[in-house]
Amino acid sequence: MEAGNGDSSLTANAKASIPRGERLDRALARASDAPLREGNRIMLLKDGPNTYDDWIAEISRAEHWVHLENYIFRADEVGNRFAKVLCEKASEGVRVRVLYDWFGCLDTPRAFWRRLRSAGVEVRAVSPPLLGTPLGVVRRDHRKLVTIDGTYASTGGVCISEGWLVTSPETGLPYRDTAVNVRGPAVADLDRAFAGTWAEAGEPLPDEECPSAEQLPAAGEESVRIIIQEPRRMRTLRMLQLLTASVEQRLWITDAYFLSMPILTQSLMAAARDGVDVRVLVPATNDLALIGALSRTGYQQFLEAGVRIFEYGGPMIHAKTLVADGRWSKVGSTNLNLSSLYANWEIDLVAEDSGFASKMEQLFEEDLAGAREVRLVQTWRGEKARPEGPLDTEDRRARRSAVGSGTGSGAILVRVGSVALQKSGAPLNTHEQALSAAASGALLGSSLLVGRFPRLVAWPLAAVGGLLGGIGLLRAARSALSGGVTTPPAPDYPESDGQ
């Protein structure tokens, strides 16, 4: 027994001898499967126009390869700017590879992809619907990533669409988003992330386009991790849990579609109750209106715990950023909701540098200057979460008409599953009751319409039912023939032409 106590004491003393920061760094590396890379130079990119200029300038200087991966790639003014420079580089002999998400680019015509391919650009779609995996549609490639020649990379929340060029007609505030570019050893991790998704959609990249971090020279003094989120891996979620549990002074978050998972919600509220300055900045008017409404249903519990919530007054704030204790900063594609943290391919850069964190805090404070705080207000029905001032009606209408990251009603349907899973076990508050009543009314109306005009939906439902039934029988037959053991099919994504 004495020996056991001695071992325990030695272990405790050993832990005490390791500085707290080093212990947290080690925990972050294990939780996120992301080693800390030193010797990098990183630069903030604010909003779409600055980000596009940076990306296009770097692409135009490419000599060996260009890797571009984005959830949305529109065939509009911005998309055509990128298409032009990508085609030019391909014609010069540069290996140009483009990954786009099948669902996110539903609105992009096939002719756009044909134009790129005819110029020599290799184009692949990620996660198109397949008969063998009908539920694979919930897995989306939500990344925004550019890597060039092993010397430059960039990631953030910016998609390729002229929606990122919008400004508010009333306030003059821009469509806000944040990206970051990086040079140095961390570029290898971003290339590795692209290589993983590229292999999901076809043949893998050649080795020369996947340099190791050890092969890349230092370019600065900043230390960063690249968190490569893949379906069901939850690496970003584990990192967020560690940070929220360890933060001591302040935690400032910007998120576009804030439907926090219960485990993260509890962590944020616990930090606020412990005296941490927890602030969350979200859009006042979301480009996915239903998601914005559902996000507000959680305001009250956060406010009661001491979390401060702000709503940005521009057309949209699409950034996915975080800064903690003036040391840790996150910039990337991951929203704080179930689909991003569990189901999607995402990518985030986490910097451990006080200088970069200071710039992130300054950017957050600039955004707060264009935001209104949500507070608890006493009403005749008790305390309710209310913003400090109403939005101008004309401005609200203009924002809702702006093109953003949503892909129509389909985007809402895919993402609303996240809400159902998060809300299913919780009692409804007043706002949720109103939303539930509206949804129930819509469902009832749809049912009456079907009852009155059954042929409108009979054939589509029969087709869907027959398809799913056939898939089920086929998989059961395969299982029986293989002795009850099914082997997951290898990814075999067809050469996509906008499908």
Regions found by a protein language model. Give the residues of each.
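Charged, low-complexity intrinsically disordered terminal segments
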Residues: E2-R452, P460-A463, L467, E495-Q499
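Membrane-helix interfacial anchor on the cytosolic side
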Residues: L467-T487
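Membrane-cytosol interface motif
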Residues: P488-E495
